[in-house]
Amino acid sequence: MKTNYEEVRKENNPPHIKLCTLSGNSEVGRNCSFIEDRQNIILVDAGLSFPEQELFGIDYLIPNLDYLKKNKHKVRAIFITHGHLDHIGALPFILPLLGFPKVYAGSFASELIKQKLKEYRIIDNLFLIKCLDLE
């Protein structure tokens, strides 16, 4: 007896998990990825990059956030791997756009994030959770 894969999949209801890189995969900078299941999105990094000289007048580039804007009700948190601008630089733009989700970062990255958000005067809305640094 043949079994239809789609029927088995529906019956077993396996977890649907997506890993998507918004930017930073084939370039240096603008690191931003997310993990998504049916009800949740967790971002990993929120970086920016600096344009080449031929993009005169543009100060920095951030990831394309269209998908996240459409699904902001699912965004639960942002995990920061480290405090370089190519991993935290877009936070001042991403956080307000997504309703200020929780940000998880190590102690050094946390301090850099606070400084960056003070520059943009949005530090009061930050929900930052310091993670233990592994040695």
Place the predicted regions along the sequence by residue.
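Short Pro/Gly-enriched beta-strand edge/turn motifs at strand-loop
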Residues: 12-18
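Pre-active-site segment of Zn-dependent metallo-hydrolases
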Residues: 27-30, 39-80, 92-101, 105-109, ...
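Conserved structured core elements
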Residues: 16, 29, 85-88, 107
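Divalent metal-coordination and catalytic microenvironments
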Residues: 19, 35, 45, 82-83
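Hydrophobic alpha-helical bundles that form the membrane domains of multi-pass transporters
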Residues: 82-90, 132-133
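Metallo-beta-lactamase
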Residues: 2-11, 109-135
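Short Gly/Pro-enriched turn/cap motifs at secondary-structure boundaries
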Residues: 23-25
